[in-house]
From Swiss-Prot:
It comes from Chlorobium chlorochromatii (strain CaD3). It catalyses: 5-O-(1-carboxyvinyl)-3-phosphoshikimate = chorismate + phosphate. One of its GO terms (molecular function) is chorismate synthase activity. This is Chorismate synthase. GO terms for cellular component: cytosol. PANTHER family: CHORISMATE SYNTHASE. Its cofactor is FMNH2. CDD domains: Chorismate_synthase.
Length: 399
């Protein structure tokens, strides 16, 4: 089972990630991992931090000659901004001068609950670890799982479908045609847009929404769609709650900072219709191949993959740090006071899509390993090809 942990503070020396459980023999390159980190840093509406950092993963263990060796993969991403925080974020040395404590929590952030939970008089430690800067380490970890899956013919990609009131307008038929070439083809096209949207009209409206929010000292959220192609039928299980693929994917997406809602397929629209209008029928083609003309279930039925494209949506709330502050209070004096501003983005929805790709990758990889087993890439690949051949034969109508 692939598991990972991250460590590090937003303005500490570095972020780190350890990925455990990766099979041996998986081809990985530092260029591919760093490409994912670069994708995370893109996007219109980002703040000053992205002008400072150029994220690169330094691999410390678990890879030899471009292939995994079955031991934990350890990676470090240096924080270039650390040089400006060596006193404020010193690990051991006591500052010669008192550093003012941060005592005003931001509405919508982890500040208040984290400060009370862990007994801090200063909110700074909460800010440092709850920051979305941590997602850089998760993107590096998820990149390893993404590359493992890609080598097996499974691709993960994302697009932005809404920023504020700006909505993606690309016809579903056109999107489906792109997905026929794999999820990465869609993501690659989205990456050409500063807001990772596919249509020019939606891009223009999204940029205008971000500009308006910035001019007003505000922030704006949005929606990202994640697609996973190449997943065969039968990953996941209905047998126990903790083996349900949809539950694991939703949990992974909700673990991302500021993601507050998840949809699988057209779930919320489905909820307002009759069953006869919702469920995806089984239709045999003239050649006897089993087909599904629709995919309203989003590629998951009974908590298992259906063999169709897995389609997930994640709703990202507007970022909590506002230049125009909301009302708050001082936890030291308990007096009302406007909230404070911590350097932040106006919009990070484009980056959220890249993070979403990263966090769902280990979920799919683990579902694959649970189904097929294997400690080395070659045996896993062989078993997957045999399973795909079995499915093709099993689901073919005999004449």
């Amino acid at each position: 089972m692939i598991q990972y942990v991250t460590a590090g503070e937003s303005h500490g020396p570095a972020l780190s990630a350890i990925v455990d459980g990766m099979p041996a023999g998986v081809p990985l390159t530092d260029e591919a991992i760093n490409h994912q980190l670069a994708r995370r840093q893109q996007g219109y509406g980002r703040g000053g931090r992205m002008k400072i950092e150029t994220d690169k993963a330094e691999v410390l263990s678990g890879i030899r000659f471009g292939k995994t060796i079955g031991s934990p993969i350890a990676m470090v991403i240096r924080n270039r901004d650390w040089q400006n925080w060596t006193t404020t974020m010193a690990q051991f040395e006591q500052p010669q001068e008192a550093i003012p404590a941060i005592t005003v929590p931001r509405p919508g952030h982890a500040d208040l609950a984290g400060c009370i939970k862990y007994g801090f008089e200063d909110i700074r430690p909460v800010i440092e670890r709850s920051s979305a800067r941590e997602t850089a380490a998760r993107v590096a970890a998820g990149a390893c799982a993404k590359l493992f899956l890609k080598a097996l013919g499974i691709e993960i990609g994302s697009i932005v479908t809404a920023i504020g009131s700006a909505k993606e307008e690309m016809p579903q038929q056109e999107l489906a045609a792109m997905l026929a070439h794999g999820a990465e083809a869609v993501a690659t096209q989205a990456d050409q847009s500063p807001v990772r949207m596919l249509s020019k009209s939606a891009e223009t409206a999204a940029i205008a929404a971000i500009d308006e929010a910035k001019a007003n000292g505000d922030t704006v959220g949005g929606i990202v769609d994640v697609f996973i192609t190449g997943v065969p039928l039968g990953f996941g299980s209905y047998v126990q709650h903790n083996r349900r693929l949809d539950a694991d994917l939703a949990a992974a997406l909700l673990s991302i900072q500021a993601i507050k809602g998840v949809e699988i397929g057209t779930a919320f629209d489905n909820a307002c219709k009759y069953g006869s209008q919702v469920h995806d029928e089984f239709i045999f083609s003239e050649s006897g191949e089993l087909t599904r003309p629709t995919n309203r279930a989003g590629g998951i039925e009974g908590s298992m993959s259906s063999g169709q494209v897995i389609h997930l949506r994640a709703a990202m709330k507007p970022i909590s740090s506002l230049i125009s502050p909301l009302q708050s209070f001082d936890i030291a004096s308990m007096e009302p006071i406007p909230s404070r501003f911590e350097r932040s983005d106006t919009c990070a929805v484009p980056a959220a899509g890249v993070v979403a790709e990263a966090v769902v990758a280990p979920v799919i990889a683990n579902a694959l390993l649970a189904k097929l087993g294997g400690d080395h890439f070659s045996e896993i690949h062989e078993r997957l090809e045999a399973y795909r051949a079995y499915l093709a034969n099993r689901l073919q109508r005999k004449s």
